Amino acid sequence: MKRYVCSTFVACVMVLCVIPASGAAAHEAVAEDAGNRIAAPACVHFTADWRYTFVTNDCSIDYSVTVAYGDGTDVPCRSANPGDILTFPGYGTRGNEVLGAVLCATDGSALPVDRERAVR
């Protein structure tokens, strides 16, 4: 009985060690995909849950923002005046994640890469 319990425990530990390693590689790929967008400044905050993502502009100027998702979902840019709270889709129930709020150009396209401010 002790041998069975010990081998079961060892097998479980091995599985738990392999799963995070594969997840970390997937997360790095997601960060690279989002790296072509400029992160919103620190005064633009976001809160994400499964259904909605709220982006709040606590800055003193307007920003055009959108949300970067782990699976590359593209949502339209929206203008946020100071004090505005914008609502975007949440991360859902299928393993997606919200990477952060990102800035948009005035024409609604992604801004060019700035590696120091890119979403990571």
Curated annotation (Swiss-Prot):
The UniProt entry, under Pfam families, shows: A_amylase_inhib (PF01356)
Q: Any idea which GO molecular function terms this record carries?
A: alpha-amylase inhibitor activity
Cysteine pairs forming cystine bridges in this chain are C43-C59, C77-C104
UniProt keyword list? Alpha-amylase inhibitor, Disulfide bond, Signal
- Kindly give the InterPro entries that the UniProt entry links to this protein: A-amylase_inhib, A-amylase_inhib_sf
Signal peptide limits? 1-32
Record's function text: Inhibits mammalian alpha-amylases specifically but has no action on plant and microbial alpha-amylases.
Protein name in the entry? Alpha-amylase inhibitor Haim-2
**What is the species listed in this Swiss-Prot or TrEMBL entry?**
Streptomyces griseosporeus
